[in-house]
């Protein structure tokens, strides 16, 4: 079996039969991905957190929380507001578990 240095794959192998841990890891992974996506898109648009907040009618600390991978309060409606302000659209896909 080939070695891997992918942390998610290693954790998955260690907890293969523990569905609760698998779910926690999946949620943490999604939160991190959403936070990174918001951050990268804002930076590419050349906006500060405060400027993006102004575009969607909120305050800078809200954007800071959304860009924090540990934040668990992401919502699709807020993501849609951010996408619209940055001239993007939200796409959601479900894929098979490998």
Sequence positions of predicted segments:
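Short basic helix-loop element that most often maps to the first helix and adjoining turn
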Residues: 1-4, 36-55
């Amino acid at each position: 079996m080939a070695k891997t240095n992918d942390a998610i794959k290693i954790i998955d192998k260690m907890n293969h039969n523990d569905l609760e841990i698998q779910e926690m890891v999946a949620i943490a992974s999604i939160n991190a991905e959403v936070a990174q996506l918001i951050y990268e898109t804002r930076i590419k648009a050349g906006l500060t957190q405060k400027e993006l907040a102004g575009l969607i009618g909120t305050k800078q600390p809200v954007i800071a929380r959304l860009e924090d991978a540990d934040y668990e309060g992401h919502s699709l409606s807020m993501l849609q507001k951010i996408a619209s302000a940055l001239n993007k659209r939200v796409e959601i896909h479900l894929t098979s578990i490998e």
